[in-house]
Amino acid sequence: MSSPVLLHLWRGAGPVLLDAVLPPLCLGCNEIVGTPGSLCAGCWMQLAFVAPPYCARCARPFARDPGPGTLCGACSARPPRFRRARAALVYDERSRQLVLPFKHGDRTDLARACGRWMARAGAELLADADLVAPVPLHWRRLFMRRYNQAQLLARMAVAAAP
């Protein structure tokens, strides 16, 4: 068989064979899932995504809707130096179990999913942005972690933005 034929066969059968030998696993609990880089239904249901109503500046969730443009108490008392920010997830025990392994445990496989969530949460900010720049990492910390998490997230969020 010629190499183009083998390549065509591999492109068709390769992913199926690979999934049979190494099935995609949930990013949260390592259960088998149908799609690589995704969460199982149980882990998905445990995540608390930030949704309106929230602070117009920092996106801290409100218990009830105070109206458009309202700032939370912290932003009203001491305005942050940024104009707007968004968060994909409420930082709780479940989201912490995803964030910390990404940040400190070499779980770069989490970047794509987190980037998609960030792109969805910050769609209006990304649409208005001329540039997305990650926070630089000190060279010592970069040496210890081997990668800049903010840079990976920024790259993935921009790639996933509509």
Spans of features found by a protein language model:
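Glycine-rich phosphate/pyrophosphate-handling loop used in enzymes and phosphotransfer proteins
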Residues: M1-P162
